Amino acid sequence: MRDLNTIDIIVGIAGAGKTTFLANLLTNKIRLFNFEFNPENTVCLSFSRMAKYVLAERLQHRYQVNTFHSYISKILANQGRLKIVSNNRLNAFFTDRGFNQLPFLKNSTDYYMADHIYSDLNKYRLMDISPEEYYELDNIEKSSDFYDLSKSEWLKLVKDFQAFIKESGSDYTDILVKGLTIAVNIPILVVDEANDLSPLMWKLIETWNIERVILVGDPNQNIYEFGGSTPKYLLLKKPVYELTKSHRVPDNILRYASRYIVYPFSKPLKGNGTEGDIEYGFVEEFIDALSYINKYDPTATSYLLSYRRKTAKYFSWLLEKEGIPHLLFNDPPYPIMSVRLYYLYHDPDQLSVHDLKQLIQHSRIKNKTKILQIFPKNEAYAKSIKANDVFSFRQYLKTLQTQPLDFFNIDEDTVAWYGKIKANPDWLSPKVNVSTIHQVKGGEADHVYVHFDANSSLDTEYRKRLYYVATTRARKNLMINPDLEEVP
């Protein structure tokens, strides 16, 4: 057990500017401790890639910020010990045993049997418990809708998977496990989003030689329990600093959301000094309002949030039917080739060498291989080609621009989306994002619709944290499904 005197905790509510505060702390603009931070004595780790990028940007890249996974991967690679299993081989492990294909190899967001069993194979490792203990937690039995394994069958599957990983290479979680075998000496470790630490990640912190650990986060925003994370490490001792004023959330929305806070702060919570709108309505009402919002405030951003991916896909379908440009799960809902075609015919300066390569690959031009050899493999040369080798780039760009749409080997869906983008270029930069609550954690929008369809069998405190995260994304207005007034 780590000495609590070597741990310092900083907590903050949603929208309180924890990342900005941390950046100012690391650049010594804010002084909390009797020592100074610098890139030589401090390592910055985060739970997610998104948080890593945001912190690195706030620090103006003075520090190298990593996720636990990327930090360990770099060390293992330098030691010649990094071998990663391919998605195809990982998928084959499950399909060979009668499970369905993993979702990341399907063009779909539905859940499949293999995805659930693979989640269990990850979670027992992230929780740092034995597969026997994990089975006794009822995690397997709760997934009985998707598979039916006895304890002996589960343990046999674990044993087979361990042998498979040893032979084929590490998956994401095994790289974290291998982190326990490396020697790490760190004067100061700063962990952003510490509310999402798993027991395995904490074991890494306890195993490595670290003089001081600084944890930053919000225990009320731990929503990755399905991945083994826990907020308990932010509750090990009294925090050295609390950020209790939200710069994002209006006063009344914060008061509403605060009803669902599980872990209280010692100081009163404050909103941003404004009053937003809180109302109940169905998704169709919110979509009707979007048409008005987009007309009178084209810069306004909006979220449509749900717990289930299936619900979010339905919302996307409704928006598409109304012709409202949007993102789905933070990505455009259309094929990238549709965008390339639009730029080719309407804004060719936006095309990169890589885009042109892809257009050539999908064209009916003969000798494509010879043509593609003109362009370097390294994307870093794209700008110099445009400037210094105008002939090779522009010649083939012009060749493609003069061709009709049927000159390209593309499917009907790509053609249809090209037509939609041509009719409404706002599809290229949508202000509306349809997503799950988990995928927008850390994000914010002016107008937020929350459809809280979380399973009622989920732990009550977990449901409260989910709802708190969802409602505190709102900067101005919040609309909630009227069936959800009593949630969680």
Where are these regions (language model features)?
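P-loop NTPase Walker
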Residues: 1-83, 258, 440, 469-472
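Accessory N-terminal region flanking or inserted into the helicase ATPase core
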Residues: 2-12, 20-21, 105-190, 199-203, ...
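Short, surface-exposed amphipathic charged segments that create phosphate/polyanion-binding patches used
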Residues: 9, 77-86, 255-260, 338-347
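Conserved helicase motor core of SF1/SF2 NTP-dependent helicases
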Residues: 11-16, 23-24, 47-50, 69, ...
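Core RecA-like ATPase module of SF1/SF2 helicases and allied nucleic-acid translocases
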Residues: 16, 49, 70, 74-77, ...
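Conserved P-loop NTPase-based nucleic-acid remodeling module centered on helicase motor cores
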Residues: 49-121, 322-323, 327-333
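Extended, charge-rich low-complexity interaction segments
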Residues: 90-109, 272-283, 352-383
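Amphipathic alpha-helical "lid/sensor" segments that cap RecA-like P-loop NTPase cores
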Residues: 111-132, 299-322
